[in-house]
Amino acid sequence: DFDGLNLTWETLEGIAKHNGPLPLDEDGAIQAYSARHDLELDTWPGPEAQVAALADDIAYNNHDVDDGLRAGLFSVDDVSDVPLVGPVFAEVKAAYPDLDEHRLIHEAIRRMIGAVVEDVIVESRGRLADAGCQTGDEIRQLGRPVVSFSETMQAHDTDLKRFLFERMYRHYKVNRMASKARRVVRELFTLLVEEPQCLPGV
């Protein structure tokens, strides 16, 4: 008869520390919850949460490359010097020289996702074999992630994030829209607090 989310310990633990262990000495909602239902905040999460964290990273990076190109914040030529991204675009251009830009971007993004996922699979298999872990608890107690990019792919990921930060996240058009959005939300909040009859159903 429970009406709501019935989250297992593993789900809560994965949400709380999918990016790794959390400091125990900080005051926060997660630490307060963990004091009642120990989430073992000083250990790495189980393998599913580690996969989710990397999948999130892969999705964000590739989505942002796609968005940045389609919004005209940077061009295909601009990404030519970005490791992984540039070579993949060059590979697609060489294979399909007459491809229009929309399809070029789509195919390159698809291949980049494939390359990064393959890297994670190979690296993680090696780490699991080296660690000899058989259970999620053994993985939690290992003291390091087992689901990970290779060292080379981690460097590519860092380079891509740096490029996106400089060319997209700090782009004046993005900052202008973010500023407008903050203003709209602030004004809407003020209106609804001062005039609650504007809320639906009131």
What are these regions (language model features)?
Residues 2-202:
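Histidine-centered, transition-metal-coordinating active-site segments
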